[in-house]
């Protein structure tokens, strides 16, 4: 959907589907930054810094997106206070999520970090039972752990009665 330097400096809204936003380390390893779901917007941060185009966006399933170039988007923001406010609220939500993830990475072991992320997904779904919104290898990358560690921690959470899991279907049993 987007690659660094593809010449499409734009704001993208995901109309349907799911996508992951990631960067590549110097040695070529993928680092998942966030997950886009239906209705999410990406790229608006480049309204302030058009030199920093280093993120990839990859569809995780059939997806449709709408994009608008930056100069047109800036004009639209000037005409629509409601859109400007929505954008500020989205920035705030992302900032809170980024801070929460940074705290988790720096202060929590892998198991509690995984469980906290699963609880967040359940909260987003509005149910203790939900479908994991991304592949386990991408979840591991997002959490800053290896896929092997993720697998071990999933097994521990199941054995300790915190979750049940059948494929990507997860149920939180206790919090």
What residue spans do the PLM features occupy?
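Polybasic "coupling" helices that flank or enter modular domains
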Residues: 78-144
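Cyclic-nucleotide recognition modules
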Residues: 32-92, 96
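Phosphate-/nucleic-acid-contacting segments
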Residues: 119-175
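Cytochrome P450 core scaffold surrounding the K-helix E-X-X-R motif
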Residues: 21-25
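Regulatory nucleotide-sensing modules
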Residues: 1-12, 16
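Structural motif
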Residues: 18, 40, 62-64, 138, ...
């Amino acid at each position: 959907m987007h690659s660094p330097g593809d010449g499409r400096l734009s704001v993208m809204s995901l109309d349907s589907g799911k996508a992951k936003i990631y960067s590549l380390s110097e040695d070529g390893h993928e680092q998942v930054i966030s997950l886009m779901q239906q209705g999410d917007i990406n790229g608006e941060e480049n309204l302030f810094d058009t030199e920093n185009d280093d993120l990839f966006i990859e569809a995780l399933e059939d997806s449709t997106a709408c994009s608008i170039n930056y100069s047109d988007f800036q004009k639209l923001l000037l005409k629509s206070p409601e859109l400007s406010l929505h954008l500020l609220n989205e920035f705030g939500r992302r900032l809170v999520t980024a801070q929460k993830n940074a705290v988790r990475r720096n202060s929590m072991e892998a198991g509690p970090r995984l469980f906290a992320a699963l609880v967040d997904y359940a909260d987003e779904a509005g149910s203790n039972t939900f479908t994991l919104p991304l592949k386990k290898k991408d979840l591991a990358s997002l959490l800053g752990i290896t896929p092997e560690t993720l697998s071990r921690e999933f097994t521990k959470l199941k054995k300790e009665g915190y979750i049940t899991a059948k494929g990507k279907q997860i149920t939180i049993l206790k919090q």
